[in-house]
Amino acid sequence: MTMSFAANRARGEIRVRYEKHGGITRPLRLFETGGLRLRHPRAFQGCVGMIVNSAGGIAGGDHLRLAIEAEEQSELVIATPAAEKIYRARDKAAMLDLSLVLAPETKLAFLPQETILFDGAALSRRLDVTMANDASLLLVETLVLGRLAHGESAISCDFRDSWRIRRGGRLVFAEESRIEGPLNRTFDQPSLGHGRRAMAFLLAVAPDAEARLESLRARLAPFEPACPHGVSAWNGMLVARLMAASPEVLRCALLAGLGLWRDDIARLWL
């Protein structure tokens, strides 16, 4: 007799609401389920939430949800204590849904460490942001294609990313990205990756975002040519895209750039 067993699929969810009371931002309500946990270490200045995935990574068919709501005048940072690993998918893609809601005068920095795509990984990720006109958002996403420390560069994967940001009820930023198939055919081309397998996206949406354009360019300039990048600003947004052959070089450039907003990012990412 032949028996088959369905693979275990992880389901995890975090729903949290923050408030500012007496000059201090703290979680007002917190719901956790599955392998996702949110911790608030006291070693950092201000309110810092660390998202912990106790599974140690994300596999095909997993579905994780994060919903973060910040009430008026809240100031907080959300980060992760380690890189997130996306393992090979046997059939279904993993799904990750992230929702951020920023009330008036809120300041939220969402600064996860790298997402590492293993060979055969499949991930569909969606980000939805709803924010007030005078709220401030700082967001970083770093993607590493393959386990480069193991020499794994010629990988194949299926990665889909969908971003929507609404400010004051209006859609101000939308992006759809897809990376699929054997990556060496794409990212080895000089016009695209030129062999680089680590990339990052930095986005600031804030009343003072455009004013930081030249300062951010100056902070990133010393990392050329090892970390080519582009920085632009418009409509209350500041956007930077970076690439490097090494995740370590990319991280150094990001730390320099993020230092424009916070000087303790290196401690967050230890």
Swiss-Prot record:
Give the UniProt entry's GO cellular component terms: cytoplasm
Q: Which InterPro entries match?
A: UreD
Determine if Methyltransferase is one of this entry's keywords. no
Q: Which domain of life is it from?
A: Bacteria
Q: Which UniProt keywords apply?
A: Chaperone, Cytoplasm, Nickel insertion
Q: Which GO terms describe its molecular function?
A: nickel cation binding
Where would you find this protein in the cell? Cytoplasm
As for what it does, the entry says: Required for maturation of urease via the functional incorporation of the urease nickel metallocenter.
Q: Subunit info?
A: UreD, UreF and UreG form a complex that acts as a GTP-hydrolysis-dependent molecular chaperone, activating the urease apoprotein by helping to assemble the nickel containing metallocenter of UreC. The UreE protein probably delivers the nickel.
Annotated family = Belongs to the UreD family.
> What is the protein's given name?
Urease accessory protein UreD
The species this protein was found in: Beijerinckia indica subsp. indica (strain ATCC 9039 / DSM 1715 / NCIMB 8712)
Traced from the root, the source organism's taxonomic lineage reads: Bacteria, Pseudomonadati, Pseudomonadota, Alphaproteobacteria, Hyphomicrobiales
